[in-house]
Amino acid sequence: MKKKNFINYCGLLGVVAFLSYTAAVVFSPLAYPGYNWMAQAVSDLSAANAPSLALWNQLSALYNVCEVVCVTVVCIGIQGRKTKLLRSGIYLFAVMEWISAVGYRMFPLSDSGYAGAFQDVMHMAVTALVVLLSIASPVIIIVAGAKSKSCRSYGVCAAVALAMM
């Protein structure tokens, strides 16, 4: 069996990011009276004036750092491996993660919902990019899986992830 290196362990930070984000999404509504998860965006929980902002920041503190480190080491690990199409899909996903991590921190909603301020316009622009890349990257990975047997498992996982969106 191959010895695991630092990059392998950094890849596990994706699990930490998932747990941090899940905790923020599950528990922050408890600090937001009247929050309706069926009618309101998750961004409302981290809006500049949201009553849940402090709890959101605490619970999601590890999310951005861990997601960016994880996706970056995945990009490092995939270099020169598999197909160019698969790598392109993974790199697009990494770009989406970086845009999400930086963009949402720079431009949280100014108010729950949409107040129309410059900050809100930028938040929506970040959201549009994140949504576009969140769809494009798995589609490219699915195509890579359909074209190459060595990428099939990546394609299946991407198809499941896309279906869950």
Residue spans for each PLM region:
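Aromatic-anchored segments of alpha-helical transmembrane domains
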Residues: 96-106, 161-165
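Interfacial segments of alpha-helical transmembrane regions
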Residues: 7-14, 81-95, 150-160
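Interfacial helix-start motif at the membrane-water boundary
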Residues: 45-65
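Alpha-helical transmembrane segments of multi-pass membrane proteins
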Residues: 18-36
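Membrane-proximal helix-loop-helix units in multi-pass membrane proteins
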Residues: 100-145
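Hydrophobic core of alpha-helical transmembrane segments in multi-pass integral membrane proteins
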Residues: 19-22, 137-140, 156-165
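Membrane-interface interhelical loops and short amphipathic "cap" helices
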Residues: 36-51, 111-121
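Internal transmembrane alpha-helix with an interfacial aromatic "cap," most often the third helix
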Residues: 61-89, 136-147
